[in-house]
């Protein structure tokens, strides 16, 4: 029997309180808020420290433990198909909404008056991104380099190859697989220790955001922000909600189940901060480890629904604000470019904003200097992007697992019905098969 823990001990309550305190500190004591930035940065760095080994262990254990290698290719193929369809829908929705609402209309901004120097670094980084460059970048120069740099796609590629190789060894490779499983348990224990610091990280990150940019900076471009937030909400409830209903579960129950991860993302504005816990929770929802290990990390580059909505809305908003005419041909061109450029969003520093700069440079018709318009509020829009991305990847994992018949639907329904109440760190580790005491000797 699971005992419900007091609310003040729950992570989501602590993070909520931390976010509120951070907002108040940043608003009333902005200098103090800015000074707390290292708290948020430090927490995210702690999470990033263990992401690479956790992805490696999860993917290798999942692939090496599978009966047939054909199922790996099948899972990857279905995942990419899902990513392409849903992210395209997200791009289209952003394009439609920004054309209907027209948040930038009437601003009549003269491009010549904008300070292009503020966005020069983003434009330079954006120009460095190309399709061929992105594909080649997936291949690490060295194995150590992939882990040292924490590049998710590079680590994922090596992990898949390692998993295949380990599977081919059969019984001879079992000691290696056993070691990797035990190492994974150590990593997840480290994550549980780090997550105790989540409220502190959320407080520091939120205090810095409000202290550095101020609530007042939201007013000038508030219409775009409101439009974007509402669009993301509707996308989650209508599009993702419809996908969930078609596959026999509720997106509302799923959101409730991952509420702690969502609050961590809200506080830190980094969806990466929730990646390790998402691997645990998706597996506990009934998806096989092999599916979770492939879909979640890959989704961080190829299934960024919130970023897709942001990219089309921001690009057309700049055109509207600067009175740059965009006919249907220009908008179709923009959409086609974004279908490619958006897939590398998580692989570059600065994520969506740099991809937006790369897109404007590639399209050519839109003024790149217009990026200065949204530079000030981009930080405030990153929360909605990250939250939508996280929910989108959670839905994708369950759907793909069901498509490839690697989902325990009874477990899914029972876990969602529980709402994640009473989940403790001990239970998380127990679900991974770790017992108290010394590890048994492998003979």
UniProtKB/Swiss-Prot annotation:
Q: Which PROSITE patterns match?
A: NA_DICARBOXYL_SYMP_1, NA_DICARBOXYL_SYMP_2
The record's principal subcellular location, in a coarse class, is membrane
Query: Where in or outside the cell is it found?
Result: Cell inner membrane
The answer to whether keyword Transmembrane applies is: yes
Against InterPro entries, the record matches this protein to: C4_dicarb_transport, Na-dicarboxylate_symporter, Na-dicarboxylate_symporter_CS, Na:dicarbo_symporter_sf
Gene3D superfamilies listed in its UniProt record: Sodium:dicarboxylate symporter (1.10.3860.10)
- The protein's superkingdom reads Bacteria
The UniProt transmembrane annotation reads 10-30, 46-66, 78-98, 143-163, 199-219, 224-244, 291-311, 332-352, 354-374
Keyword terms:
Cell inner membrane, Cell membrane, Membrane, Symport, Transmembrane, Transmembrane helix, Transport
Q: Name one GO cellular component term.
A: plasma membrane
Give membrane topology per the record: Multi-pass membrane protein
Q: What's an example Gene Ontology biological process for this entry?
A: L-aspartate transmembrane transport
Gene Ontology terms, MF aspect:
fumarate transmembrane transporter activity; malate:proton symporter activity; succinate transmembrane transporter activity
Q: A Pfam family for this UniProt protein?
A: SDF
Family under the similarity heading: Belongs to the dicarboxylate/amino acid:cation symporter (DAACS) (TC 2.A.23) family.
> Entry's HAMAP family?
C4_dicarb_transport (MF_01300)
Q: What does this protein do?
A: Responsible for the transport of dicarboxylates such as succinate, fumarate, and malate from the periplasm across the membrane.
Tell me what this protein is called.
C4-dicarboxylate transport protein
Q: Which gene encodes it?
A: dctA
């Amino acid at each position: 029997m699971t005992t419900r823990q007091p609310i003040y001990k729950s992570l989501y309550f602590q993070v909520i309180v931390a976010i509120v305190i951070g907002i108040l500190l940043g608003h009333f004591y902005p200098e103090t808020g800015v000074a707390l930035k290292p708290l948020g940065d430090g927490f995210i760095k702690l999470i990033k420290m263990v992401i690479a080994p956790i992805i490696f262990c999860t993917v290798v254990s999942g692939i090496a433990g599978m009966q047939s290698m054909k199922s790996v290719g099948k899972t990857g193929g279905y995942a990419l198909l899902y990513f392409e369809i849903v992210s395209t829908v997200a791009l289209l929705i952003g394009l439609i909404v920004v054309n209907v609402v027209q948040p930038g209309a009437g601003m009549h901004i003269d491009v010549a008056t904008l300070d292009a120097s503020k966005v020069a670094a983003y434009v330079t980084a954006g120009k460095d991104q190309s399709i061929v460059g992105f594909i080649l970048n997936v291949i690490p120069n060295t194995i150590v380099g992939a882990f040292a740099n924490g590049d998710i796609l590079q680590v994922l590629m090596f992990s898949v190859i390692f998993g295949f190789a380990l599977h081919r060894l059969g019984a001879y490779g079992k000691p290696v697989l056993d070691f990797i499983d035990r190492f994974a348990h150590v990593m997840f224990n480290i994550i549980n220790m780090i997550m105790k610091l989540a409220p502190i990280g959320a407080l520091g990150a939120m205090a810095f955001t409000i202290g550095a940019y101020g609530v007042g900076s939201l007013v000038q471009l508030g219409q775009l922000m409101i439009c974007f937030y509402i669009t993301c909400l509707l996308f989650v409830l209508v599009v993702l909600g419809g996908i969930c209903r078609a596959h026999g579960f509720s997106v509302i129950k799923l959101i409730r189940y991952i509420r702690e991860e969502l609050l961590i993302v809200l506080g830190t504005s980094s969806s990466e901060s929730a990646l390790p816990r998402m691997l645990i929770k998706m597996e506990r929802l009934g998806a096989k480890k092999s599916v979770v290990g492939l879909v979640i990390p890959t989704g961080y580059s190829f299934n960024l629904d919130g970023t897709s909505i942001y990219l089309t809305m921001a690009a057309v908003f700049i055109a509207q604000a600067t009175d740059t005419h965009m006919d249907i041909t220009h908008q179709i061109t923009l959409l086609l470019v974004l279908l490619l450029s958006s897939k590398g969003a998580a692989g570059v520093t600065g994520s969506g904003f740099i991809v937006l700069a790369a897109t404007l440079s590639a399209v050519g018709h839109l003024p790149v200097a217009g990026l200065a318009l949204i530079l000030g509020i981009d930080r405030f829009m990153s929360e909605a992007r990250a939250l939508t991305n996280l929910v989108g990847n959670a839905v994708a994992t369950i759907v793909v697992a069901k498509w490839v018949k690697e989902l325990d639907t009874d477990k899914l329904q029972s876990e969602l019905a529980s709402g994640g109440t009473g989940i403790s760190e001990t239970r998380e580790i127990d679900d991974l098969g770790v017992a108290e005491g010394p590890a048994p000797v492998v003979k």
